Amino acid sequence: MNEEIKQKFCREFGTDRVLLEEPMKRHTTFRIGGPAEVFVMPENLEEVQRILEICRTEDLPYFILGNGSNLLVSDRGYRGVVIQMDRNFGEVKVEGTEIHASAGALLSTIAVAARRASLTGFEFAGGIPGTLGGAVVMNAGAYGGEMKDVLRKVMVMDQSGKVFEIPAEELQMGYRTSIIKTAGYIVLGAVLSLKEGNLEEIKMLTRKLSEQRTSKQPLEYPSAGSTFKRPEGYFAGKLIMDSGLRGYRVGGAQVSEKHCGFVINTGDATAEDVCGLMKHVTETVYAKFGVTLEPEVKFLGEF
């Protein structure tokens, strides 16, 4: 990307909301990643449309960033435009048994709003460290619940900037996938359909799931969450543990001793370390069990 295009972004959106060569390790839960050429923080829908228009005109790749969870950015960074949709797109509103939320709303924030309104059905997502947008795209789930269980409709933007709604029955949601992911749509917001519940029971379930997460997951280290998808009929973490890889390290990346389904950053891990570790894990598990592990983490940049 030439300097003139970079300055165009700065002029249009302001130097306080356009960062050049911004280290992506500042914006991912893995705390790993080289610089993004242009990092933009739009304030509203119209600005997102304008950014996409510039990207189309100048033939620039772009990436929509929420909370930076479930993401591994290359050490060489990203040669394109990162569009961060978090705090400026974080509205959460309760209407009866429905919650209307914008794409940048944290799942934990939505879970708190649901609990305060005595609405049940979203407890599973309260501890997932991500935003609504990313969770909808990949049909995020935990503890027996998935986003598809609670979605009524989703507002999206296509790559041309057109905005429209997709009802839940047309989202084609499966295990860590959706039509939004396959079509490359941008999530702007969603309506969640929950049920009236008992406040004390909701609090008890929330506390129980939180305790499970804290006791079983390596929350004290940076990570991208679950590193591999769950193979049909198996658990990735158990396959990795039974392959003798608990605590296995490559550089600063390590298979968590607390939960083998997590690769953690022990302090100075690089994307190269993580990729090397994932490759070794995948090859070892396949050699021992004949099961191919697929990454759940998304890769951004050149690897």
What are these regions (language model features)?
Residues 19-20, 157-284, 288-303:
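Phosphate/pyrophosphate- and phosphate-bearing ligand-binding catalytic cores of soluble enzymes
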Residues 31, 84, 100-102, 123, ...:
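Conserved beta-strand segments that form the floor/walls of ligand-binding pockets within enzyme
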Residues 33-34, 39-45, 72-90, 137-168, ...:
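Structural signature of FAD isoalloxazine-binding scaffolds in flavoprotein oxidoreductases
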Residues 35, 68-72, 79, 106, ...:
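Gly/Ser/Thr-rich beta-alpha loop segments that engage phosphate groups in nucleotides
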Residues 58, 65-67, 150, 221-222, ...:
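Short, basic and Ser/Thr-rich N-terminal targeting/leader segments
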Residues 70-71, 111-114, 122-126, 139-146, ...:
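A generic local secondary-structure boundary/capping motif
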